[in-house]
Amino acid sequence: MVNRLIIAAAGSGKTTYLVRQAMQQSDSVLITTYTIANELEIRKKFVELNGCVPHNVTIQTWYSFLLQHGVRPFQGVILDDKINGMILVNEKSGKKYDGKYGPVYYAETDYRKFYFTDGMKMYSDKIAKFVCRCEKETKGKVSQRISKSYPRIYVDEIQDLAGYDLDIIKSLLQAECDVTMVGDPRQVTYHTHNEAKYKKYADGKMEEFIRSECKKIDCIIDKETLNDSYRNNQSICSYSSQLYEEYGETGTKQFDITGHDGVFFGETR
């Protein structure tokens, strides 16, 4: 199988690239992305280029993907209760009480309090960890099932995945499917959760994760395919490249002259 991590420049046509790649496939394709806004953008691009989303292409947000393919089919190995969806959280969930030195949280052994609200909605910051636990308990059947359902998987906004998300990515990279990950580490906007696990790979350090944690897994690191920006001219690209020297020089496909091009510095009054 062919796995690939593509480091994309801002305005490089990432969405167009993903859609065109998916349109070339005859087998089942999954495109998953972190934000709802980007999911809608991908759907719009399919309509623009193809008139519709092809029947063999599924587009889901990362959370929806994990719930449908990781949680619901395998939750029985952990609990028999009915799960009533999820609840988005922006801080660590499962607080037991406020202690003298800060919040005290439920242990994972109390899984109902650790993973769920009283109404059995799963905390968003625990979904990936729950899926990883299912993967471990079933000896890899979660990733096996996903790979059989989708021989080709495209993960957009890879820079926003964190913590246990990365373990799920690692499992998929070892499964019988082609995984293409695309993202711009210079544009980390959100994190799926603030987990201590793999903290050193936060802020878009997916390349470092692949090189360090996936050494025995074949994965091409591609810094060329989406390295030219259609949005920014060379002055802007060169300035940006100086801020992120570790990613090399970004090129441009933007050659229009408007009279107000380039980088400007304003004075504070």
Language-model-detected regions and their locations in the chain:
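Conserved coupling/interface region of RecA-like P-loop/ASCE motor cores
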Residues: 190-201, 207-252
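Glycine-rich phosphate-binding "P-loop"
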Residues: 1-12, 125-130, 248-268
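Loop/turn-to-beta-strand initiation segments
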Residues: 28, 151-152, 176-180
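A short acidic, amphipathic alpha-helical/loop segment
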Residues: 17-21, 45, 142, 164-172
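Signature of the SF2 helicase/ATPase Hel1-core->accessory helical subdomain module
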Residues: 159-210
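Accessory N-terminal region flanking or inserted into the helicase ATPase core
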Residues: 2-7, 84-154, 163-164, 168, ...
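P-loop NTPase Walker
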Residues: 1-73
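Conserved RecA-like ASCE P-loop NTPase motor core of nucleic-acid helicases/translocases
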Residues: 18, 27-39, 57, 224-229, ...
